[in-house]
Amino acid sequence: MVQRWVDQPGDVLDDTEVPDEEPDAGPDLVDLLPAGHVPPGFLPVLQAYDYAGDEVTLVHADDARLRRMAVFDVLINNADRKGGHILAGVDGGVYGVDHGVSLHTEDKLRTVLWGWAGKPVDDDTLRDVAGLRDALLGDFDQTLRPHVTNREIDALYARTVGLLENPVMPSPDRRRPIPWPAF
């Protein structure tokens, strides 16, 4: 068996290497913060109590990369976008971990990225949504068919059309707005 450890920022492999700079201190892209302490550049999602009984606020960064992920989640009807499924890469990218709890024909959107609820979708993102709609009318649906059902493709198409006709981020379902646990 061969195993390779993936070096992390700040790791030092031997005495000759200089450690990487420490990452900036501050909240993660999605985080729990003490109630009333939402820093600039972050959007509150909900108020809750932590395991110690203290009030906390679930927040996420007001970041264009996360906003695009939130739109993607709306389109694919992601039922499981947890905070731990959003990774900040050392390359500056933001990556979503998805495992197939999406593309359902019934509305099942559950995400921690509700900070933009009720806000308009930006024009650049709408152009991409229109591109997806057009691709689904072309050959892209044939690429998807071996992997998802016709009904799921039809639902995806309907969500693209719906977002283009009403380019506003949806509001959460009051019954089950976020996946649990949130991280």
What is the role of each PLM region?
Residues M1-F183:
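Phosphate/dinucleotide-binding and metal-coordinating scaffold of catalytic cores
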